[in-house]
């Protein structure tokens, strides 16, 4: 046996360090914690009797107490001897020298050295206790652990493995390295002394079964790393045994005369020693596996489970002959159902290491067939990291054996190339590429040097097109290209091949592309060019543009050069071939925006530029489709860059085209508007087609010099006068006139303008607004929607916001809509947005199209509502107009709830008091509508009245939890509500309640938002409206008054005012820490009084009168109404947005009694919608699988040396349910 080299070491005995690391005693009920693990012979504590200990190491002298000494190592570089824990914590010293020092200490006195090692593990767990020599001699492990448990600091939940900070950053890696180096340095002698390893394994096994999380976590990590180090030792022993056996066989096969008997005896002796050592290692590993792994791989703590799975993966990969079998793979398979993503992730990474080695595939066949479906389902895991690794694992499975995965399995992965999460999509793209594109037929080898249609990529490009069409997601070609960009760059950048497939005739016997396939190929080609030129993923993938490296920038420039050189020549040909196909032309016309325009000059390609401009002109003349015309306009815009010499050539072509269109339009318009003649359909079509072309170009180009406003105004005015103008002409005329105004404003803003320019623009804008206002009452809905949208844009652009940023010279352009225009805009919203959806469909065949049209219509209505709400938020229209919007909150919550809720939030940021008055106004409007419909003798239990109360409750929830912040607004809200309730006296006399008294029942929903002293003040104000007879009434008709009075008196006698009173315990917990600093505010609040009017008057001036002392705050001076978006960043304080500070879940708990009283409704509370992850979750599976699981674990049986392999029996099938589960688990679905 080879002994470790001895290093002379002198040990200094140090006093106990004062440094302790606190942790908490995190007791947890772990399944099986009280079970006595069956231990092998080496799992005993293995301590010798006191007499034997006295003889060991120090010559029979009594060892010093462990509490008065801590082991250290030699002084190095002037650093004094330190504890093992301190050295590992620092992570700076060479770990091997630290271990060598400890080995020398162990040789000198193994009890003291082991005591230091035991205290090392205790300290690494964050326990401040110390195991003394007395405890080590006379106490069992369980007693020591119980004693250490008592030493934990229960006020802290941290321990070294979980502590944050730079000093703990490398602790885990240093800790693991120490254990690995310790075993490696002891592998030739000390680990076989039946003392050191027995003691360490016994201690770690006991600690791993502790109820204290820190002990369990740290000891499990140590035991697993110890096991990994032992596996490495066992592997080395196996290799040495095989080598020894070969040497023995070679020597024995020699002729008798040449055979060395002494060498044979030495080899036999060596093999015997190695076999004994291997048996010892087997016993140690069995003890760790049975005592730690089989219990901790299903621990309640995810980190502990993850450690076990990670290490077993290492064992199977490192020593596959011993561990890569069904007996151990089953643990990984079971744990793939773990409820925590990090544990499932460890399972997948462990399996990846196995499937990556193709030599191990034969040992994984049974596991693959058993757990393949689970792996496939994990591609939809709710944790994206897990889904990515599952796809990568399936890619390795695919490479190992294509027959394993069925077509259905592959299809489950294919569709993930369209995932919005880029890592998932990229992994799926690699799987797709390996499956469909990586194989090459032998006959294609000769085509490697060919390009274009005859090149090797031609068939692959066709395959990509076929896949894209079969996936039926034709609007997402950019996502498909991005998914495959990293793994199939060469294929996707073979633009010569794509161009050849489009332009060249098919070879003999080759099937030509269909029209649908050509459209798909053009779309894919466009997406690959965009990806190469822009070097960032499409919208929705990635957080934004990243800074490119120098290599990426060079690749980008090279690609743009290739693109320009190829398509500058090919694009005119492609446009000529597909000039009548709107879809193909629209995509092809986007290519020039990715060109390097300088190459037109440097490459002498001007004639190809002229050909391109001719083709664009022809397309403009042929097409009237808006998408095609806008694509032509954008192409001219991309080519008209003044930085390049081609600008003049392109500008002349563009001007000639616009000249012809403008002249034609004026000529056609003159004939079209002639008095006394009815225009025929052909004239109308000519006017419309020309107007479409001009409008499309005016979107991207400044056409001010053609003075298009006058002719469009004339056209629109005639439409108003006659009322028979075709709707499409009106729509495009409105749009074109809108562009004229915007281009003039841009010109005035960017350059110095004259007063005449401002006045002309002001006049045109005012006249245009009047035109749009007239068209709001048009009979055609599409025209009205266009007029409304443009009018909202104009009002937003020319509002007071136009002067922001120091542009005071634009003040003459500010336009504020009058009350009639505001009324018409609001009426349009009420008539065209808040309408019932038509749910009946005419036929089953058209049901899908009908559903799509409904979604499209809803999207359009949402845009209309958002445009009007923007006017409210930016104070372009009066805030009280929002009352008609807010009152629809409940009825149309599913369609517009998010828009209305955001509008409430923004208006409250601008003016809390005015927002509160708007909310109460909306409730008053609903109340009046109910009175008009049902009369004053309505049933207060009716659904209509209950709906108004529910809406009031929702409004109350939106005020959040900070009552100080909303104090003024709530006070004003109650004031307006009280005045409304007593506004209409009963004609029958004072003995009968006021007509609107029932409104107090609705107003009581806001009482919980009043501060305690404000409730008293509001109560006093309420009494101003009450007569003596009213206070004595107890009939049912007076119940609203009694209910409201009681709501104001509730909590009035409390000595302690709580800003968040009424919250449940859960809500209080959420804000407990944040509520502490408010004590100072409370003292101020206690001294406040609400200023009351002297008489029972409803005037705001009396309500708002203030005394010189501190009063309950009421309506302050209205702040300057500025847009929340246009404000400077410093004005956008976090508290200005209550939506982000006060989650609605806490508000839900604020009034639990109201919830119970009302029962279930459409929305139980006013909280942000919880979007459930569409991906599957495997939560809850591990408990079901663990319950009743039979842990009849096997002994670790290392494979014999080659001379014994023929006697090895086959292992049983450990995936047989009978061998791993009892009857209670057989019915559990694994997938």
Swiss-Prot record:
UniProt superkingdom: Eukaryota
GO molecular function, one term: chromatin binding
Protein's GO biological process: cell division; chromosome segregation; meiotic cell cycle; sister chromatid cohesion; stem cell population maintenance
Residues with the N6-acetyllysine modification: 607
Residues making up the signal peptide according to the UniProt record: none
Keyword Membrane: no
Gene Ontology CC, one term: cohesin complex
Residue numbers carrying Phosphoserine: 1058, 1061, 1064-1065, 1177-1178
Region named Disordered: 1-75, 1062-1087
Record PTM text: Phosphorylated by PLK1. The large dissociation of cohesin from chromosome arms during prophase is partly due to its phosphorylation.
Main localization of the protein described in the UniProt heading: nucleus
Positions of modified residues (Phosphothreonine): 1112
Domain SCD, first and last residues per copy: 293-378
Chain intervals with Basic residues compositional bias: 36-48, 1071-1082
Modification sites for N-acetylmethionine: 1
Compartment annotation: Nucleus; Chromosome; Chromosome, Centromere
Keywords assigned: Acetylation, Cell cycle, Cell division, Centromere, Chromosome, Chromosome partition, Meiosis, Mitosis, Nucleus, Phosphoprotein
Known partners and oligomeric status: Interacts directly with RAD21 in cohesin complex. Cohesin complexes are composed of a heterodimer between a SMC1 protein (SMC1A or SMC1B) and SMC3, which are attached via their hinge domain, and RAD21 which link them at their heads, and one STAG protein (STAG1, STAG2 or STAG3). In cohesin complexes, STAG2 is mutually exclusive with STAG1 and STAG3.
Family: Belongs to the SCC3 family.
Function in brief: Component of cohesin complex, a complex required for the cohesion of sister chromatids after DNA replication. The cohesin complex apparently forms a large proteinaceous ring within which sister chromatids can be trapped. At anaphase, the complex is cleaved and dissociates from chromatin, allowing sister chromatids to segregate. The cohesin complex may also play a role in spindle pole assembly during mitosis.
Name of the protein in question: Cohesin subunit SA-2
Gene (name only): Stag2
């Amino acid at each position: 046996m080879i002994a470790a080299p001895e290093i002379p070491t002198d040990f200094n005995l140090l006093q106990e360090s004062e440094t302790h690391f606190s942790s908490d005693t995190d007791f947890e009920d772990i399944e099986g914690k009280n079970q006595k693990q069956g231990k092998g012979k080496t799992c005993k504590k293995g301590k010798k009797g006191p007499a034997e200990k006295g003889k060991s190491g120090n010559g029979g002298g009594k060892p010093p107490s462990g509490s008065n000494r801590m082991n250290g190592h030699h002084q190095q570089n002037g650093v004094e001897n330190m504890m093992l824990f301190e050295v590992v914590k620092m992570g700076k010293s060479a770990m091997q020298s630290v271990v060598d020092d400890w080995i020398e200490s162990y040789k000198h006195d193994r009890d003291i050295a082991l005591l230091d090692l035991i205290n090392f593990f205790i300290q690494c767990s964050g326990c401040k206790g110390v195991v003394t020599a007395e405890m080590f001699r006379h106490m069992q492990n369980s007693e020591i652990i119980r004693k250490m448990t008592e030493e934990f600091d229960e006020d802290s939940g941290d321990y070294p493995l979980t502590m944050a900070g730079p000093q703990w950053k490398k602790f885990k890696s240093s800790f693991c390295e120490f254990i690995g180096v310790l075993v490696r340095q002891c592998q030739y002698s000390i680990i076989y002394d039946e003392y050191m390893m027995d003691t360490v394994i016994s201690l770690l096994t006991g600690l791993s079964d502790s109820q204290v999380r820190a002990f369990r976590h740290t000891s499990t990590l140590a035991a697993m790393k110890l096991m990994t180090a032992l596996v490495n030792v066992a592997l080395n022993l196996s290799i040495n045994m095989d080598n020894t056996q070969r040497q023995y066989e070679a020597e024995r096969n020699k002729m008798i005369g040449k055979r060395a008997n002494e060498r044979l005896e030495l080899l036999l002796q060596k093999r015997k020693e190695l076999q004994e050592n291997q048996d010892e290692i087997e016993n140690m590993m069995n003890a760790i596996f049975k005592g730690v792994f089989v219990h901790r791989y299903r621990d309640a703590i995810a980190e502990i489970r993850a450690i076990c799975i990670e290490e077993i993966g290492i064992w199977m990969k490192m020593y596959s002959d011993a561990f890569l079998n069904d007996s151990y793979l089953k643990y990984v398979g079971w744990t793939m159902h773990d409820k925590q993503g990090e544990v499932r992730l460890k399972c997948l990474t462990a399996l990846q290491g196995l499937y990556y080695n193709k030599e191990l595939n034969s040992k994984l066949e049974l596991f693959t067939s058993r757990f393949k479906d689970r792996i496939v389902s994990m591609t939809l895991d709710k944790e994206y990291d897990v889904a990515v690794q599952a796809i990568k694992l399936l890619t390795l499975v695919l490479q190992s054996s294509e027959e394993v995965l069925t077509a259905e399995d592959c299809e489950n992965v294919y569709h993930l190339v369209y995932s919005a999460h880029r890592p998932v999509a990229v992994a799926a793209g690699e799987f797709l590429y390996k499956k469909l594109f990586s194989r090459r037929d032998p006959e294609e080898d000769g085509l490697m040097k060919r390009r274009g249609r005859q090149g090797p990529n031609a068939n692959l490009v066709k395959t990509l097109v076929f896949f894209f069409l079969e996936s039926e997601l034709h609007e997402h070609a950019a996502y498909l290209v991005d998914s495959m960009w990293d793994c199939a760059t060469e294929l996707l950048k073979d633009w010569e091949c794509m161009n050849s497939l489009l332009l060249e005739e098919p070879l003999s016997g080759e099937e030509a592309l269909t029209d649908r396939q050509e459209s798909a190929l053009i779309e894919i080609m466009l997406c690959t060019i965009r990806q190469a030129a822009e070097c960032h993923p499409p919208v929705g993938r990635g957080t934004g543009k990243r800074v490119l490296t120098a290599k990426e920038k060079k690749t980008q420039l090279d690609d743009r050069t290739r693109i320009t050189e190829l398509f500058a020549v090919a694009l005119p040909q492609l446009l000529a071939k597909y000039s009548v196909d709107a879809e193909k032309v629209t995509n092809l016309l986007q290519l020039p925006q990715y060109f390097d325009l300088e190459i037109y000059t440097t490459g002498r390609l001007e004639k190809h530029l002229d050909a391109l401009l001719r083709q664009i002109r022809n397309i403009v003349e042929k097409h009237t489709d808006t998408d095609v015309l806008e694509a032509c306009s954008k192409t001219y815009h991309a080519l008209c860059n003044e930085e390049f010499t081609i600008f003049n050539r392109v500008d002349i072509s563009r001007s000639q085209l616009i000249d012809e269109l403008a002249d034609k339009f004026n000529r056609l318009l003159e004939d079209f508007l002639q008095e006394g003649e009815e225009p025929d359909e052909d004239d109308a079509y000519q006017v419309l087609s020309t107007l479409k072309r001009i409008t499309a170009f005016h979107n991207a180009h400044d056409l001010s010099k053609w003075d298009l406003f006058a002719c469009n105004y004339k056209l629109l005015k005639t439409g108003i006068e006659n009322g028979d103008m075709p709707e499409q002409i009106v729509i495009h005329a409105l749009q074109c006139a809108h562009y004229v105004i915007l281009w003039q404003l841009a010109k005035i803003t960017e350059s110095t303008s004259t007063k005449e320019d401002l006045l002309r623009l002001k006049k045109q804008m005012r006249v245009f607004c009047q035109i749009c206002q007239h068209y709001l009452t048009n009979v055609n809905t599409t025209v009205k929607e266009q007029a409304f949208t443009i009018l909202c844009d104009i009002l937003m652009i020319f509002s007071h916001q136009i002067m922001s940023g120091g542009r005071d010279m634009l003040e003459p352009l500010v336009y504020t809509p009058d009350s009639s225009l505001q009324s018409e805009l609001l009426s349009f919203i009420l008539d065209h947005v808040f309408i019932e959806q038509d749910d009946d469909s005419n036929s089953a065949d058209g049901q899908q199209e009908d559903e799509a049209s409904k979604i499209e219509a809803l999207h359009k209505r949402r845009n209309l509502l958002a445009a009007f709400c923007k006017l409210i938020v930016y104070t372009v229209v009066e805030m009280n107009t929002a009352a008609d919007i807010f009152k629809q909150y409940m009825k149309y919550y599913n369609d517009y709830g998010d828009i209305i809720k955001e509008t409430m939030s923004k208006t409250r940021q601008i003016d809390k008091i005015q927002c509160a008055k708007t909310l109460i106004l909306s409730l008053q409007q609903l109340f009046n509508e109910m009175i008009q419909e049902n009369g004053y003798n309505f049933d207060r239990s009716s659904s209509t009245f209950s709906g108004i109360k529910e809406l009031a409750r929702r409004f109350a929830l939106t005020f959040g939890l900070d009552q100080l912040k909303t104090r003024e607004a709530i006070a004003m809200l109650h004031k307006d509500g009280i005045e409304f309730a007593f506004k209409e006296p009963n004609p029958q006399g004072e003995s009968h309640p006021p007509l609107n008294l029932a409104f107090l029942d609705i107003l009581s929903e806001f009482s919980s938002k009043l501060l305690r002293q404000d409730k008293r003040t509001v109560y006093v104000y309420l009494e101003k409206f009450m007569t003596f007879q009213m206070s004595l009434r107890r009939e049912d008709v007076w119940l609203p008054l009694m209910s409201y009075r009681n709501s104001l008196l509730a909590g009035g006698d409390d000595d302690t005012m709580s800003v968040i009173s009424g919250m449940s315990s859960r809500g209080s917990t959420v804000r407990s820490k944040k509520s502490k600093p408010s004590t100072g505010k409370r003292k101020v609040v206690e001294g406040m009084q609400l200023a009351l009017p002297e008489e029972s008057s409803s005037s705001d001036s009396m309500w708002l009168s203030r005394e010189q002392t501190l009063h309950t705050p009421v309506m302050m001076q209205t702040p300057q109404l500025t847009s929340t978006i246009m404000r400077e960043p410093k004005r956008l304080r976090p508290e200005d947005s209550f939506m982000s500070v006060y989650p609605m879940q806490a508000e839900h708990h604020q009034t639990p009694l109201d919830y119970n009283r009302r029962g279930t409704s459409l929305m139980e509370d006013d909280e942000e919608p919880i979007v459930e992850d569409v991906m599957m979750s495997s939560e809850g599976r591990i408990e079901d699988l663990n319950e009743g699981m039979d842990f009849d674990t096997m002994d670790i049986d290392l494979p014999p040396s080659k001379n014994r392999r023929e006697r090895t029996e086959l292992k049983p099938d450990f995936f047989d349910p009978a061998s791993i589960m009892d009857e209670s688990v057989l019915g559990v679905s694994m997938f």
